[in-house]
């Protein structure tokens, strides 16, 4: 049943079950099992073997990400246990005035950390959660801000791991300059641009709607946000030390600097490559492990000699940090397995979707809009934007042709935009999972609350890509998308009440 309509069934079953039952683990397991059943023609024994073979392959390829998560969990636990987080929260309560300021500062930090989406999600959550907790900001709202400044920011940054992913998705032997093509897609990556515009609007005005408004109202009336919103495992990491703000900021600064250094190092900066080429060729997951380990060693040397925290309490952070990351690790492993089941090696969902795109190539002026919708669906169903790049960009090159370079730029931009939109909405996406982990928010609650926002921004982006196709001018599409977004924001501002009040 490979490369047929049945390839759509497992991810869609997973998503429907997750949204209906709010049980993401079981939903993923059922979806993976159904996909393996389809692949093995309902041979139960082969289904089980296939499931674990795919899991072994996918988790093995991503083990560096898991190590990074564990080390980061330990760092967060140690920072909290040292008392540095409490000191930072006290400082924030005096200097940051209200929810609006805390959310805008979260957004600003997300814009600054553009090198990698995984790193962005967890670092922004670690730094900003003490502040947003002080002002009783809903965990779902924080997760939305984190998610909206992860992939959408990275896909617009020339110096990021995402630029490399786009270049590597071009057909083998292509004469196209991948990095140059990526640079030209930046101003017409409509979803990424509009998502950040809308996110700032929501943070500034406090006007929420849909599931997000319901969650914010519930937390305001029940005072559920009076307590720290994290998991019990994170709560175990109580303050026992005498840390200061510097004991939080210095490890985070070293973490950022070390990860940037890791990307340059693994990309070949020491071999004479330029900065842009080094970022393009880096091994981002290995870089994150290297950077997090350097930050961990630095933190130990910063804390222990000064007796900010005792050696025994520091060692306790190993178990606490690991336990805090177990839910995210488990979901990631299952999500990677699901993406493996629908990969070209098994059910080949990408091949099926690619066939649909090729069959509609004659629609001409609507190609950017078609690529946007198809990329969004594919990323939503598989949970991977990079995989979507790899499937659809070669198809765009074949359909549009290198000779129509402006048309190719529009097509690739719409693919990148749609992939980020689908990734942003998908409950089985890595970045969605990590945004939930960074905000210590229930994962399905995060998916439910941000989905209406994603769809609204995607609709404005779709309008922009229709204009792009008609005019063959990316700036015209950007203008149309911004006008559409401005109209939506005006309606929300005039018709909806303030839900997230800016309490001082």
Where are the regions a protein language model picked out?
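Membrane-core helix-loop-helix motifs of multi-pass transport proteins
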Residues: 131-223, 237-247, 432-489
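Membrane-embedded alpha-helical segments and adjacent helix-loop junctions characteristic
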Residues: 44-143, 308-403
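C-terminal transmembrane helix pair
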Residues: 134-135, 326-330, 334-346, 361-389, ...
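Inter-helical loop and helix-membrane interface segments of multi-pass membrane transporters/permeases
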Residues: 2, 40-57, 164-188, 209-239, ...
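Hydrophobic core segments of alpha-helical transmembrane domains in multi-pass membrane transport
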Residues: 10-20, 31-38, 68-77, 107-113, ...
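Long, contiguous bundles of hydrophobic transmembrane helices that form the permeation core
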Residues: 182, 195-281, 293, 297-317, ...
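Hydrophobic transmembrane alpha-helices of multi-pass solute/ion transporters
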Residues: 1-74, 87-91, 95, 254-334, ...
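Hydrophobic transmembrane alpha-helices that form the pore/transport pathway of multi-pass ion
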Residues: 93-179, 381-421, 431-445, 485, ...
